[in-house]
Amino acid sequence: MMEEELYKSVIVTAKSVRSVLLEETSNVEDCQKNLNALGQIVSASSQSQEYRSQILANNGLPDVLVEILNRSFQDNVPTEELKFTLYIRLMRGILLLARNLVITKQFVEFSSILSSLENFNQKVSHNNEFYSKTLVVYIQFLANMSQITREQNIVAEIVETFFKNEDLMSLIANDDQMKMPFAAFLKNILSNSDNLYDVLTHDDTILRYTISELDKADIHNEDLDQYSSLLILTFQNIIAHETYSKWLKRIDCESAEFSRIMKLNQVIVTSKEDWDNYQLTAMLAWIFDNFLVFSEISKSILLSSIYDPLELKRVHLNLIILLDCLSDLGKFEATKQFLEHYNAIEELISLLRVVHESVDRKTLKNKEKIEETVGKKEFPQVKSLIIEVIAFLVHGSFEIQEKMRELHGLELVLSNCMIDDNDPFIKERAIVCVKFLLANNEKNQQFVADLEAKQTVDDDALKEVGYEVQIEDGNVKLRKTENQKLQEI
């Protein structure tokens, strides 16, 4: 069939369907005939990009489809049962065709689709056999269109159409054919920064829905299903937006809700390996702000003789989450630059000192004794994570090396070059950190040598770092061991 003849047959069918749907002048036989013709067009449009491009070459077809969308399910809906069913089926066919075509070319606005969906909801009972089938197509239509356009200022319309309709949301939640494209639609819409800004500043309904769905999903499973993956992609966009920090401040940091959100934040932050600098800066804003808050609270509780164990547990949970996020993002140079700019090393050393002095080291020898001590504070894993963060800040930075010595952080890290069951791997992390602190820094090396001379540094710990103390001309000096020299060759 020639291209012109092909288009002509499609436009003739579309106009005929328009007449049936909008003018209510046809009989049952006309409806059936149009259904058959429309079905063939829908089938062809789902299989061939070339076919879709050909029938979209003339603006006439999109205009007809948009007119049908804008005027259907209003006053022209037939009341006779058979005709009503055929009306819905014809409309579903038009939606299927529009769904297929919109991935090739945008010819309709989101508002037209959402408005048509609302009219459909008002006119068609949920018990109708074609209700769910048609609703699926509406949502697929929205999902397809959202792939090629990031239309702005539609958050309020989405909330009005979907989230204020509890019955509709219940149907979506219990039907994978709806739930999947709906999640894809929201993910695509929230890829637009302006829409995200709307969600985070004006109406956070979509954000809270995403959090609720993530709570139900098994996002810790390595083999994520497609729905969970879509939710994670959506939340990645959210937490990496510059306004998320302000939204998070609206949540009481002492609430269970805050802790629940922070757990999700941790999973999402640590699940991605290719954050860009803009995203990193946005995330570090809320991570570091909250780290400062929980660091101060932690120090206050640990230094107090009277405290609430439940509060300590809650604060500890949130602090671990924030330190884990900083540790994971430490692989990015932008993170290092951010933390250096905000002088994070001072707070890290301050917190490390308080935890080190307030919480007893746990070993095989004293484990039972510590556990039996009533009211003994436990704050596991914190020191290990702090030292890991310090290590990546120190690495290759003479300025941070100097600050660590001046702020007496160097001896703190040295004091942790030993096994502590409260902090798995702290010995290994501390040894790496000390290596970075001593690398090409004579003042730090001399400082450690002087400490060793006063017998305040463990010889074995120094050897593991790759250094040993020697006396030269009556002066105590730190030198690399032969093994360390060989490793560097």
Swiss-Prot record:
It holds the Pfam family Atx10homo_assoc. GO terms for biological process: cell division. The keyword Transferase does not apply. It is found in: Cytoplasm. Gene3D superfamilies: Leucine-rich Repeat Variant. Keywords: Cell cycle, Cell division, Cytoplasm. Its main location: cytoplasm. The keyword Transmembrane does not apply. InterPro entries: ARM-like, ARM-type_fold, Ataxin-10/CTR86_families, Ataxin-10_domain. GO terms for cellular component: cytosol. It comes from the Eukaryota. May play a role in the regulation of cytokinesis. Belongs to the ataxin-10 family. This is Ataxin-10 homolog. It comes from Debaryomyces hansenii (strain ATCC 36239 / CBS 767 / BCRC 21394 / JCM 1990 / NBRC 0083 / IGC 2968). The lineage of its organism: Eukaryota, Fungi, Dikarya, Ascomycota, Saccharomycotina.
